[in-house]
């Protein structure tokens, strides 16, 4: 690193070069976050339920978190989404259309004790899942 009176050009050039060794900068500058994001930068996405799955909670908790495997309509990618609420999984059937959004973990990752699940189900067949769980609305018959 230049230390002298006229070292500004070298300092500037070095800082521009060395910031590529910072993983956060490299991911942002390379647009890698958007490339790897199944929702492609969108806040929500729609998909078709492929199957219901039970995900075991991480230690020290002991539970089976009810999740669904969803294939996104926009790009065909498959993701896991958590069904929030007591008995919420009973309102979701295979081949239903669901709307998912990020679960809100740090850096866009999974949250709490549910490993590998980054998304949460908000709507089932265009009806809010929370409304179905508390009994305020009924799931439409097809």
From Swiss-Prot:
UniProt GO BP: translation
Molecular functions per Gene Ontology: rRNA binding; structural constituent of ribosome
Highest rank taxon of the organism: Archaea
RNA-binding recorded as keyword: yes
Matching Gene3D superfamilies: Nucleic acid-binding proteins
InterPro entries: NA-bd_OB-fold, Ribosomal_uS12, Ribosomal_uS12_arc, Ribosomal_uS12_euk/arc
A cellular component annotation (GO) from this entry: small ribosomal subunit
Keywords: Ribonucleoprotein, Ribosomal protein, RNA-binding, rRNA-binding
Function description: With S4 and S5 plays an important role in translational accuracy. Located at the interface of the 30S and 50S subunits.
Binding partners and assembly: Part of the 30S ribosomal subunit.
Membership in a protein family: Belongs to the universal ribosomal protein uS12 family.
Protein name (record): Small ribosomal subunit protein uS12
Native source species: Methanospirillum hungatei JF-1 (strain ATCC 27890 / DSM 864 / NBRC 100397 / JF-1)
Gene name per UniProt: rps12
């Amino acid at each position: 690193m230049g230390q002298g009176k006229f070292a500004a050009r070298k300092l500037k050039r070095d800082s521009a070069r060395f910031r590529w060794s910072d993983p956060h900068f490299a991911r942002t500058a390379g647009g890698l976050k958007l490339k790897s994001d199944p929702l492609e930068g969108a806040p929500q996405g729609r998909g078709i339920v492929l199957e219901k799955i039970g995900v075991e909670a991480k230690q020290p908790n002991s539970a089976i978190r009810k999740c669904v495997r969803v294939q996104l309509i926009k790009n065909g990618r498959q993701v896991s989404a958590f069904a929030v609420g007591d008995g919420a999984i009973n309102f979701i059937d295979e081949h239903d259309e669901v709307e998912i959004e990020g679960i809100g973990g740090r850096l866009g990752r999974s949250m709490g004790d549910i490993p590998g699940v980054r998304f949460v189900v908000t709507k089932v067949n265009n009806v809010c899942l929370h409304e179905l769980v508390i009994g305020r609305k009924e799931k439409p018959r097809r």
